[in-house]
């Protein structure tokens, strides 16, 4: 786990607890997307270098997001600004999404294949994984021609590598002892 992930965890946890308490998970997801989008904009990055005061930086975010930002979001922005933590917004968002998935009893699966898979095959894979893990499954699918043939399935810290690239590596390793 990276340092940024470690720092982001308590922020994401606190935000998620507020979201659960107020039944505003989707709203908070949108707020986090909004804040991280602004913070990552190339013109805005100059402000994040520390050249302006945290109070003024907070005011800029709050002014831009008048329609979406409530009191709790204002407090988050002030806290991120005072602690110079806008650089970990992606980590906070990713952790928030993981907390949401856990709360809703969903696992997030990363699926890579060497070529494009048809939707019905992806659905079959989803059903197998749902039966295996006894949870709803959200698949994030990507095509990666570097794996030659087959697929790689990643669930949390577990990787099922069914790629030709992996089989060739295992064969090579066994021949080289």
UniProtKB/Swiss-Prot annotation:
It is a peripheral membrane protein. Its main location: membrane. GO terms for cellular component: plasma membrane; proton-transporting ATP synthase complex. Keywords: ATP synthesis, Cell membrane, CF(1), Hydrogen ion transport, Ion transport, Membrane, Transport. It holds the Pfam family OSCP. SUPFAM superfamilies: N-terminal domain of the delta subunit of the F1F0-ATP synthase. It is found in: Cell membrane. It comes from the Bacteria. One of its GO terms (molecular function) is proton-transporting ATP synthase activity, rotational mechanism. Transmembrane segments: none annotated. The keyword Cytoplasm does not apply. F-type ATPases have 2 components, F(1) - the catalytic core - and F(0) - the membrane proton channel. F(1) has five subunits: alpha(3), beta(3), gamma(1), delta(1), epsilon(1). F(0) has three main subunits: a(1), b(2) and c(10-14). The alpha and beta chains form an alternating ring which encloses part of the gamma chain. F(1) is attached to F(0) by a central stalk formed by the gamma and epsilon chains, while a peripheral stalk is formed by the delta and b chains. F(1)F(0) ATP synthase produces ATP from ADP in the presence of a proton or sodium gradient. F-type ATPases consist of two structural domains, F(1) containing the extramembraneous catalytic core and F(0) containing the membrane proton channel, linked together by a central stalk and a peripheral stalk. During catalysis, ATP synthesis in the catalytic domain of F(1) is coupled via a rotary mechanism of the central stalk subunits to proton translocation. Belongs to the ATPase delta chain family. This is ATP synthase subunit delta. The lineage of its organism: Bacteria, Pseudomonadati, Pseudomonadota, Gammaproteobacteria, Enterobacterales.
